[in-house]
Amino acid sequence: MTSQKGLRYDGSIDKYPITEGEIYSLGNGSKITIADITLGLPEFSKNADCVFIDPAGSKGVLKAYYTKAEKQCPVDNFDEFVAHIKRCIEQINPDRLFVECFYRNKKQLVPMVESLFPHVKIYENIYYHKPDCKCWIIQGTKQAEDWGLQGMDEWDAVFKICKDVPFSSITDFFMGQGLVAQAAYAAGKVFYGSDMNRNRLAVAISKVAKRGGEWTVTK
């Protein structure tokens, strides 16, 4: 059973008690809200011209995410989950897509990106700044591009993407605790974030606030 402390993460939800239907916004147009992609994307996410996502690596991990969000997992298998991801990307129709993946979900996510973009590049990366923690970033673009992400830690790669890639806005519909939000804010870029877990989103909101972001809340 997941502990109450685990469900609440660092307790940011007490300061930023985001609820269903609320939108947290910054002055530059960046927005965060609660959403489950199996039920649809927030409309503002469809305005992004760049996407970075780090989806669950397996059906078991996905089920655990729903448990932590105190919700029932609505998909029967991982392929069904990937189909929801693809549908969301098609609705956004971005110029560039970056998908972080791991050994367990790489075989499903690479073909998905290949079906959406004419140019696909796969970078080998690490996470937690540990060489033995391997991951990959799958890049889908309309033109051949190399953003120099090979070998980087995923944290540094996301900050590099937000700093160097010429997008107008970036969306992450698995926003979690807000790596993409922090990186985009640090680069002065607009971001759109959503996640089904309000406690995780509260951490993202808090981390951007600690970088100077001033949030307003609307319904």
Stretches found by the model and what they are:
Residues M1-K219:
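Class I S-adenosyl-L-methionine-dependent methyltransferase catalytic core
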